[in-house]
Amino acid sequence: MSAVSGWWDDFFWGSLVVVELFFVALIMTILFGLIGAGAKLSNNRVAKSIASGYTIVFRGTPEILVLLLFYFGSAITLTTIAQIFDPEIKFVDFPPFWAGSFAIALIIGSYATETFRGAFLGVDPGQIEAARALGISSLKTFIYVRIPAMWRLALPPFGNHMLSLVKDTALVAIIGLEETLFVAEQAIGYTGKPFTMYIVVGAIYLGFSTIITFTVMGLERYANRHLEVTR
């Protein structure tokens, strides 16, 4: 492991980038998933069609292709807009961090849409009827009754989505974001030790995955605590 000794700082900062990317993409994933699930469960045909198209496209397209299309497509769009105001501008780069965050969130959000939709359908209708009988508005019922009940059902599969999300952060290395895999590629160029560097990256991601797994297990126990008490 002597080949890695001069790269620990770089791997540390690369790991922090992975953490930042994970949490930003996670927030957007939840938003995309909730919006998509709400649209698929609505009575609006247009909203249903858009949500269905979203899940079909992003679940059926290779993840690396989505990332590249989003990154370069955004850069081309920004460049076109900028050239309207200043024809001398040749190219406007889109920040790799935000391109990666949006692309990963769109991909995982398409899976989360179906997870949340199924969880919403699994909520006991009696809880909704009880809220209505108490005169609670539809919005408050959705926020305080349906979402908490839905989360209990959605947590196990959503934990898998979180694992997929953290692993997908490795893809952003191809658009120049300096995360752990990018650092490994740089280190390999200097040391000529690809196996060693990839083992380090694998260990880092395994550590992240382990933390996520135990976190989700803890959240599941918390969400089901009232069920354990009644047994």
Per-range role (PLM):
Residues 1-231:
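Transmembrane alpha-helices and adjacent helix-loop boundaries
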